[in-house]
Design a protein with these regions (language model features):
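Residues on the lipid-exposed face of transmembrane beta-strands in outer-membrane beta-barrel proteins
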Residues: 46-50, 63-71, 106-112, 125-129, ...
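Transmembrane beta-strands of outer-membrane beta-barrel proteins
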Residues: 40-46, 76-84, 104, 121-127, ...
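Cleavable N-terminal export/targeting peptides
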Residues: 1-38
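Predominantly the C-terminal beta-signal and adjacent terminal strand-loop region
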Residues: 37-39, 153, 159-197
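Extracellular loop and loop/strand-boundary signature of outer-membrane beta-barrel proteins
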Residues: 50-52, 93-97, 137-143, 176-179
């Protein structure tokens, strides 16, 4: 009978540990599920920036729509979306450079969240296509094509009770990858604000 008490105590301790582990796992799963559900809604964004070279600069203002895609990897830490945007490029280059040019773009993006997908911080990147409504001139010459690749890389953070606000720093390179000469390209640094709805 002396051994019965320690055996019961060990069994009771094991039961408590199992309950505690199950509760913690359930809470962690619920938190992860809640966070993973957040990016699956559309958002609109505005951003502004300028080219990274010295001399005559090109400033850009953009309005865009982010549409979630149903692809994710690494237990939801990497999620995908589609950026569809309209940009105004304002150039200070000398004639024959056009003062304003409009860019239409579509870029599939992949976003990685830190801390097993639960962090408000993220990095993202993607490569897509864009179209300029007129030939764009840079200090190094004109673009050889109106159709270009658009490479995006960003880092940012979500805010708010439902993480509905987002601020990020974006780097974007636009060029035709040498498919048509000349190909000076432009690289922009931009600040973005997005709101999820």
């Amino acid at each position: 009978m002396r051994n019965a008490a320690p055996a019961h105590q060990a069994g009771f301790a094991a039961l408590l540990c199992t309950i505690a582990f199950s509760a913690a796992s359930g809470a962690a799963t619920a938190a992860a599920d809640e966070l993973q559900a957040l990016p699956q809604t559309r958002s609109i964004y505005v951003e502004a920036g300028y080219t990274d070279h010295r001399g005559p600069a090109t400033r850009t203002r953009t309005v865009g729509l982010r549409v979630p895609l149903q692809y994710s990897w690494w237990q939801g830490r990497i999620r995908t979306h589609l950026d569809v945007y309209l940009s105004d490029w304002a150039s200070t280059a000398a004639p024959p450079a056009r003062r304003h040019n409009t860019q239409l773009g579509v870029v599939p993006m992949a976003r990685y969240r830190f801390a097993d997908g639960q962090s408000p911080w993220f990095v993202e990147g993607g490569i897509g296509l864009s179209y300029l409504t007129a030939t764009h001139h840079t200090p190094n010459g004109p673009f050889g094509s109106r159709w270009n690749f658009s490479d995006h890389l960003g880092v940012g953070r979500n805010f708010g009770a439902q993480r509905q606000h987002e601020v990020s720093l974006q780097a974007k390179h636009v060029s035709n990858a040498g498919l048509r000469k000349p190909n000076p390209g432009e690289t922009f640094v931009q600040i973005r604000y997005a709101h999820r709805f």
